[in-house]
Design a protein with these regions (language model features):
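Extended Gly/Ser/Thr-rich low-complexity repeat segments
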Residues: 48-63, 112-134, 167
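Autoprocessing Asn-cyclization modules and mimics
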Residues: 2-90, 96-110, 140-150
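Extracellular beta-strand-rich solenoid/capping regions of secreted or surface-exposed proteins
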Residues: 87, 117-131, 143-161
């Protein structure tokens, strides 16, 4: 997707006040999205709480090919033999969202730059747009834990100063 023009600061300044604050919302893709598409379709679009001008991240969470036959040390992990699209992501602006059908129309872009599959657990993450971000000592920002279809990502767009004395934790 061509770089969207974010509505800088549309989510205002943000200051964390406790441990474990969540700033993102998530929805899994319900249909594959291919290079050039200007829409993505998700399950439970209303959970994203999207509006025109929001930023989203489309990210492929799984789908790599792993060779477990190469494991000789007793661990459960194999060698990645083909990443396929696992880990690919892009940021896009939202032109419109239909919460009934789950269709999100991307904002004036030339379409997606990558392919994303529902079987590979691609998801859409709402990316808040802050003027400033302050995470004081004793506070933290975290994301939903990865549940096999969504979560596991923390993402923010900050226009100005970021103060990080606390933590941003994506380990859940």
């Amino acid at each position: 997707v061509s770089r969207p023009t974010p509505l800088v600061g549309m989510d205002a300044a943000y200051k964390a006040t406790k441990v474990g604050e969540k700033v993102n919302t998530y929805a899994p893709l319900s249909a594959n999205a291919k290079t050039g598409d200007t829409t993505v379709t998700v399950t439970n679009a209303g959970n994203l709480k999207l509006a025109k001008g929001d930023l989203i991240m489309v990210i492929q969470m799984q789908g790599a090919e792993v060779d477990f036959a190469s494991v000789t040390d007793g661990t459960k992990y194999g060698a990645v033999s083909n990443y396929r699209n696992a880990g690919l992501y892009e940021i896009a602006g939202v032109a419109a969202v239909d919460n009934n059908t789950g269709v999100i129309t991307l904002d004036g872009c030339g379409g997606l730059k990558n392919n994303y599959t529902a079987a590979g657990h691609a998801q859409v993450v709402r990316v808040p747009q802050y003027t400033t971000l302050d995470v004081p000592t004793g506070t933290s920002i975290t994301g939903d834990a990865w549940d096999g279809s969504k979560g596991g990502v923390v993402a923010m767009y900050v226009q100005g100063k970021t103060s990080l004395a606390g933590k941003i934790d994506a380990s859940a």
